Curated annotation (Swiss-Prot):
It comes from Pseudoalteromonas translucida (strain TAC 125). The gene is atpF. GO terms for molecular function: proton-transporting ATP synthase activity, rotational mechanism; proton-transporting ATPase activity, rotational mechanism. The keyword Transferase does not apply. The chain crosses the membrane at residues 7-27. Keywords: ATP synthesis, Cell inner membrane, Cell membrane, CF(0), Hydrogen ion transport, Ion transport, Membrane, Transmembrane, Transmembrane helix, Transport. It holds the Pfam family ATP-synt_B. Its main location: membrane. F(1)F(0) ATP synthase produces ATP from ADP in the presence of a proton or sodium gradient. F-type ATPases consist of two structural domains, F(1) containing the extramembraneous catalytic core and F(0) containing the membrane proton channel, linked together by a central stalk and a peripheral stalk. During catalysis, ATP synthesis in the catalytic domain of F(1) is coupled via a rotary mechanism of the central stalk subunits to proton translocation. Gene3D superfamilies: 6.10.250.1580. This is ATP synthase subunit b.
């Protein structure tokens, strides 16, 4: 056996093997590797997008929470102002009602006082007439006259 022929045979066999591998084995392996690389890149890109979306959603949620707190504070402030306004209105209305009741009371008292005064005047007039009748029935006597006047004063 000749060493050169063996080496040339091995070189030809190796070249055929390499060409066969490059033609039939390497493209599917290379395609699988590229597909895997693309899948990994897509996964990383999706992960980055998801991370950005999560960050954006967290910012949006924080902003909405902040807005909700501001709105809640505004609603509470408006409710407090409305409560103060209602209390003030009711206080004014209560004072007006009190003044009205007091005025009615004064009016009723004045009316009752006028009625009692008128009644007393009528009684005094009646007593004066009765006293005058008694005086006229008796003879005009100083002692009897004094006695009748004292009785009238006692009745008044």
């Amino acid at each position: 056996m000749n060493l050169n022929a063996t080496l040339i045979g091995e070189l030809i066999a190796f070249t055929v093997f390499v060409l066969f591998c490059m033609k039939f084995v390497w493209p599917p392996l290379n395609g699988a590797i590229e597909a895997r690389q693309k899948k990994i890149e897509d996964g990383l890109a999706a992960s980055d997008r998801a991370e950005k979306d999560l960050e954006l959603a967290q910012k949006k949620a924080a902003e909405q929470l902040k807005d909700a707190k501001v709105q809640a504070a505004d609603i509470i402030d408006q409710a407090k102002k409305r409560a103060v306004l209602i209390v003030d209105e009711e206080t004014v209305r209560g004072q007006q009602e009190r003044e009205k009741i007091i005025a009615q009371g004064h009016s009723e008292i004045e009316s009752e006082r006028n009625r009692v005064t008128e009644e007393l005047r009528k009684q005094v007039a009646t007593l004066a007439v009765v006293g005058a009748q008694r005086i006229l029935e008796r003879e005009i006597n100083q002692a009897a006259h004094s006695d009748i006047v004292e009785k009238l004063v006692a009745e008044l």
